[in-house]
Amino acid sequence: LFTPDWIVRYMVENSLGRLWLEGHPEASEQLLPTEEEQSAYAAGNRNPEDTKWHYYLEEAEQEPEVQAQLAEIHKEYAALTPDQLKVIDPCSGSGHILAYMFDVLMKIYESYGYTTREAVASIVENNLYGLDIDDRAAQLAYFSVMMKARQYDRRFFSRGIQPHVYAIVESNHVDKFAVDYFCNGDAKLTTAMDTIIRELHDAKEYGSILTVTPQEWSALYDRFVEITEDINISREVALRELLPLVQVAETLAQRYDTVVTNPPYMGASNMNPKLNEFIKNNYAEYKSDSFSAFVIHASQMTKQSGYCSFFTPYVWMFISAYEKMRNYLYNRTTIETLIQFEYSAFEEATVPVCTFAFQNRHVQKKGCYLRLVDFRGGMEVQRQKTLEAIENHNCGFYFEQSTDDFSKIPGSPVAYWASSKLFDTFASFDTIGDYYDVRNGITTGDNNTFLKLWHEIGENSERWFPCNKGGAYRKWYGNKEYVVDWENDGQRLKTNVDKSGKIRATLRGIDFNFTEGITMSRVTSGLPSFREMSSDSISESATNAIYPKSRDRKDSMKLLALLNSKIGSYILPLLNPTINVVPEDIRSIPVKMERLTNVSGLAETNCILAKEDWDSFETSCDFQHYPLLRKVSTIAEAFEQWQTECDERFNQLKANEEELNSIFIDIYGLQDELTQKVEDKDVTVRKADLGRDIRSFISYAVGCMFGRYSLDVAGLAYAGGEWDASKYASFAADKDNIIPICDDEYFE
């Protein structure tokens, strides 16, 4: 039961249920809850006998021409009778989805006037199919369907009807004599069996993404009936080995009205060689993960008038590796509904997930999207918010959007929460990539050897150079903590090889070494933050580095102002809301350079304020004096002055950021989406903190006692090399570098 029950309900109701209701709207009173029933269900007051579809999302309001097109499609659905529906879970596991498909089909049959006994028999015989690669899982799914049938019809076991739920079998070791006996010299049977055997070779490796050629199935089954009473040594082998092959082949070859599944998630690097090669050969444009191949194949298994629904990782919505999959869905299908869950909501998986349903043909219509990314608390909270959105479309996290708009954004991400104004901005503005180079930095291959914190090296070392290496959320300036070995143009890095002679380092972007620009942490779990990058530094792979093609510092400051504004933190997650931001995401941000004329000065001021804050602590390589060293008589007075200084810096930076927000919101026309206000928690210079600052002051005092710092010299007084006693006139450092800690007073 890997997929949560309410998500199973959502998937089935918005695919199989939607298909039926669009052709038979008169059944909605029997199948859908009233407003009162929905409110009671959402509040937790549930009637055990209530089997209505509480997770069904009504279709978004459409333009008149779209409504006319949909009306023609609905006529096709209206011609369907319940016994004509074919539905499948091709990755059925223990049968959770199949069991709820059974319930929904029962409601459909009842609304159509069938008796319960007739409905149960028809569902098992005509409607429901399941496949799984695992034999035990398929047995459990078979059992689930049988128990569900028994729930509705107590005499079902006596009726001799078998579910179409199978474990995928492979033909690798089929008995040739049994095949010859079964075909009995019939050319058509021989051709059919040869094809099935060839196509199901290694089927256990590939599962239900196999494509199987349709055959004359009735002729094959007639032959099985014919040999049932035959007396031949190969009869039992043929029935035991060949019948499952034919059943699985037919199930794979059929086209379905609805496909609903939670496909396996497996990146290419974790696939076995056979599966990896198979997906490369058959799903080359969708090879990043097994789930993407399954989504495409499920579409191919579905009739043009049908629906598919899935529960998958949501990476396909945004990152470039899945752009081909997105384009397939945009151009060949119509996304009807999608729920994007909070990043860690689904604890059973190690990836952020979504669930979605699409119609297997393209119509220029709006779909319904739920954005639940801000609601922490696990899947129960996500369920409650889903029910809230179904009841109240004005909840703030329900959106209606056409996939045709997504192609206006570079990379075509599923940016369903973007406004029409922002889509127009993407279509009419230039992009950052037109004016700036965006690069990932070097990977050393051995950080312990080639990367150090700046305070781990000697003061005048010619081997080490400042290195930008990501870090915590901090805007404008800072996170200057590391140095990299780049002596003689990185000679040691370039000649460091593994046992096979391969260079361990990956030297990306080295043409931009020692170039002024902007840096940001590549991995970020919150808002993005950008900082100025000095011309004496090198970028490492944990950062994205941005360089103005003009090599003009003013252009760096203009873009830094934009990226650190609310525009940057609004648009970048549209392009990629995952924790891993790549250069292409930054290049794709829309920009109008000619309108960024009055922002570089504010950005410069913000960098100065952030540098003052960063350099106030020992962790900065440009630290000069501890800020509590002031010409006052008590620490309390010094702290009060320091507190005033910090507050002024904080308030000035906040005011500057709000002014920049106002400028950019006007440029981008997003007054309805964004406000200029900056929350205190998003201002990344520090306010005074008595406990922290006194502890830090004690640390500085210890540094003075040991000679690392001096009251007479700015910055580091000693970091190795020759000792200069003249630097310590006001306060002498300890001569032997040993200071006992005891109960007696140290100063006499």
Model-predicted segments: where are they?
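Polynucleotide-recognition surfaces of large bacterial nucleic-acid defense/processing enzymes
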Residues: 142-144, 152-256, 331-336, 344-502, ...
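SAM-dependent methyltransferase catalytic region
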Residues: 3-337, 361-368, 373-378, 384-390
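Short, glycine-/Ser/Thr-/acidic-enriched flexible segments
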Residues: 92-95, 135, 172, 264-266, ...
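Carboxylate/His-rich catalytic cores and anion/metal-binding grooves
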Residues: 87, 247-261, 463, 481, ...
